[in-house]
Amino acid sequence: VTVVEMLDRILPVEDEEISAGLEKLYKKSGMDIRTSTTTTNVEKTKKGVKVTLAPFKDGKADESKAETIEADKILLAIGVKGRFDEAFDESLGLQVVKDHIKTDYDPAHPEPQELTYKTSVPGVYAVGDVIGPPWLAHVASEEAIVCVERIAGHDPIPIDYSVIPGCTYCHPQVASVGFTEKMLTDRGLKKDEDYQIGSYNLQAHGKAIAAGHNQGIVKIIRGLPRGEILGAHILADQATELIAELTLARRLEATSEEINVTVHAHPTMHEAVHEASLASEGRLIPG
């Protein structure tokens, strides 16, 4: 298997440590990972496909260093955008901005707001992928509920778009919520002054060993001085299940201390969350 990624790392929206960890595991399993690489040509052959690859830098492909590989099949997976062609009569006059239907939702402002999801046409509402990122099924579902409840005259609790879990169903899985370390440093925050990080490797985790999947890491970023959960990033066999606890913690503005004093059942994968939280305070007990 050859994975071709135009950017400089796989899963570029995830925490860099998680991306690097997944790439290391994939290479160890025999996968060929090509980052900073693009596809310049694809030809169908009798046996499958012939693909031309070239280094990609500064928005350009370096054709002088192109190479060709052959494969049985090719899978194109370069992102998601809302598709609404033929979904409505164009004569309605719905306002479309940057490939999405315009509503009172603005991806640039993820904080909780009393949104209606009204479009530019009275009586017409839009939710989900067609109104912009994040393009996630669980977000679309929640938007639909909030939208309909507001139409019905209720006063639903607004969605906090800064607390949306992201899940990648690879193996091992990847899941995250909140800020990555780079996002914090880009905002001028400094490690050990404004935030601390706790990481817990699953290599010695009892339940992970018993299940035969002890490769991965749980990483928690907590703010200073209060200890609130700023971000959480997981590479693990059950990462998409584990992220729920940390999503709830961030939504309720819980602190690492509150996670630490919560007894986690043993043996469970959720103990890894507890261990990472302890590590963020420098209290991890060596196992």
Model region roles, listed by residue range:
Residues 32, 95, 193-196:
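Conserved beta-strand segments of alpha/beta enzyme cores
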Residues 44-49, 121, 212-215:
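A short, glycine/Asx- and small/polar-enriched loop/turn
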